[in-house]
Amino acid sequence: MKKHRSDPLFEPLIIKGLTLRNRIMSTSHASGLGDENHMPGETYQRYHLEKARGGLALTMFGGSSYVSEDSLWASGQLNISTDLIIPHLQQFSESIHAEGAAIMIQITHLGRRAEPNTQNWLPAMAPSSVREIGHRAIPREMDQQDIQRVVKVMGEAAYRAKEGGLDGLETMAHGHLIGQFLSPATNKRSDEYGGNLENRCRFGLMVHEEIRQQVGDDFIVGMRMSIDESAGGGSDFEESLQIAQIFEREGFLDFFNLNYGGIDTERALATQSMPGMSVPSAPWLEPIGAFKQEVHLPVFHAAKIADIATARHAIHEGLLDMVAMTRAHIADPNIVAKIQRGDEHRIRPCVGASVCMGEQRPTCMHNPATGRERYWPQKIKRSNEPQKKIVVVGGGPAGLEAARISAERGHEVVLFEASSALGGQLRMATGVEWRKDMQSLIDWRKNELAVLGVNVRLNILAEADTVLTETPQVVIIATGGVPGTGWIEGAELCTDPWDVITKAFKPTGRVIIFDGTGRHVGPTLAEHVHGNASSLTYLMVDDILSKELTYGERIIWRQRFAKMGIHPKGEQTLKSVKANGNALEVTCVSELTGKIWITTADVVIADTGTVPVDDLYRKLQQTSNNNGITDVSAFLSGKNQLDMGKPGMSLFRIGDALSSRNVAAAMFDALRLCHRL
């Protein structure tokens, strides 16, 4: 293992007797992996264990772990309001410590962010009855008994964290109950808990005093807070600094975990506190660094720090004490280990796609094993069986990942790609400026295929003879799909959406875009058409724009549509397109009223997904030993698909060659099929 004495990332940090082995960490986040009893079971623990094995210094877990039953919002949240969690924490901490890493939890009361319709139907409460847009509850105002109760249960939760063998904890003041008392936007009280800054700090200080009484002086306690929420009417930089200095003065804290902006709207989440692909790298490092100069406690920070160069800069320049690469570790939990062995160039980069913040959190578009470590491997093991010859046809996401995993298994892999470049449909996604980082999904795999010795053959439209000449034991068809509009009457009059996205055709005049999927294609078309068309009508089958995407992607498209002046018309069905002189007559139906309406256009572009390119698959079926059939049970359970008793070639298809889905599905197909081949 290489020594990195000159690397600032590998300088240990000591906090109250705890030595953190390097400066890289993962912050607490709501992974959604808690079990049915809101406990950190095996699935939850394995997710964090991979990061510890990968070499980071500190993994923090349990984002929004609730201290009482009126602080719920999601089924996967952890419940630290009961002693039942202690054995789980003990097991958890032992496994993380065995890998040389430290472990801490976040405890909180959500206040107005609690969702009253979740499980127990208790009303949300807050310092004042000020509604939050994001979680939508109208909270009741807390009375003195509520305040005393929350102070007490926060202390009890902290005691459980210590009994569980954890190294420390953080409270969540950023947008949660403590922060709601701190902020003038949410605290409208006129008693001793509201008004001036000292009063607004009172509740938070009471909480931390109680925590310190419960855990003693040796246990590490920090607070997560925003350094500037002024855009939402909250505390600005100067007042936030005063808050931090007040808490420092009282001596209850050992570190600050600092963020920027608000969390009360999708826009604030996607552009401020958890910035995605549309935001530049590490947008808040400079203001966080300025804040750090005015406090004395160690400072942690996470916000789109996705590359090692930026992380090194943050530590070297004294902007941070611990650099949190949370989403970067979702993409690759082995970041530190790869640096240590000289493989920094092989780190799988986070592209900021925000899939990990969606309903399937913490899954990663780039890394299908994340969040599924209990069943699917982060590290592909080399096969103990004789090497096989595997042919992959198609160099899109599914084909690239299938080739990579098969090569990791030690097999001889040949990949055929019909075009002059790898990437498939992903190459079109990078054509929109704010999504250009998607190119990293292609580039990383290209590099891995080169390292692993995959024989990549471009500009070859593989036919059956092309494949069979290779005498493979396994053939994987990953030929993707092409736009399919066959169900629309007059589909032949519609313009191919890919021709527009690739700029092979520039629509002008009156343009209608029909978005029948709720994915990226429709809005991407709008970006390409806007400015060239004399008029643009955007119709969609869904009630909201980009419905199939995560909130972090939806809000960016909505912002861009607002800036372009595009007003999408929802719940519409495109029925037919007919020629009418030099124009097109377009017939639509409102799903709300059933009313048929007709308009005219010069160009109609419809996105209704893709249909599989499966001609080659059909031709090879009869020559395969499995008739091209995938054993679904084996596929789901991760078992080997191959019947070693049968001679000849086994044939499979994955990704859009099977069905029109997304990149994450294509990657997962490849993992499930190939990791046991």
Identify the residue ranges that each predicted region occupies.
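Rossmann-like dinucleotide/flavin-binding elements
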Residues: 384-418, 422, 458-471, 478-551, ...
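A conserved short coil-to-beta-strand element within the FAD-binding core of flavoproteins
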Residues: 458-470, 570-584
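Flexible, Lys/Arg-rich cytosolic regulatory linkers and terminal tails that connect or flank
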Residues: 351, 357-369, 373, 564, ...
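Flavin-dependent oxidoreductase catalytic cores
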Residues: 1-393, 397, 401, 405-408, ...
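Rossmann-like dinucleotide-binding cores of NAD(P)H-dependent redox enzymes
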Residues: 412-452, 520-521, 525-574
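Short acidic loop-to-helix transition motifs that present clustered carboxylates
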Residues: 306-309, 330, 461-464, 500-502, ...
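Hydrophobic, well-ordered secondary-structure elements that form the walls
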Residues: 256, 291, 314, 326, ...
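Short beta-alpha connecting loops at secondary-structure transitions
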Residues: 270-277, 321, 426-434, 542, ...
